[in-house]
Amino acid sequence: MKVKDTKLWGVKEIVPERFCDFRGTYLELYDSKKFETVTDKKFVQDDISVSSKHVLRGLHGDFRTTKLVTVLKGVGYALIADNRKESPTYGKWESFTLSDQNMKMLLLPPGIGNSILAMSNEIIYFYKQDTHFAEGKQFTIKWDDPKWNFWWPVTSPILSMRDEKGGYVD
């Protein structure tokens, strides 16, 4: 696997090694021994969301959970935002195309707001977490918060009530 730093402090982009032949493709998404070189976190929960085109989930995060995210099917526009006041990249954001073709993964430390916008008819978004979900411990950054100046490839995404309300950063 290839690992590289991103523009946001502590965020890693990871590309697993792929093996392709006439039968298709094989790749190892996660091996705890290999990931020991990338993070000391132990993942305890896996989650999947399935979304149709232009559904936007996020931006969500908390200050205690490390996440490993990827798209297993389709194409997603992943936008992440640094909401850690102590971080040298606080208030900055970065976007990535995650897809079943590039199989890129993002390792997100606590305090990073995480979102995925479905760009294909259907996406399957997969993420591992090193803590169990805790109701009421998450933050939501509003997708169109003017202080962040996010760029999205669509102007009217499909949002949940939670994401529609969101929260603005002071």
Would you name each region that the model predicts?
Residues 98-121:
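Conserved metal-binding segment of the jelly-roll/cupin
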Residues 1-101, 122, 127-170:
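Non-catalytic, conserved peripheral segments adjacent to functional cores
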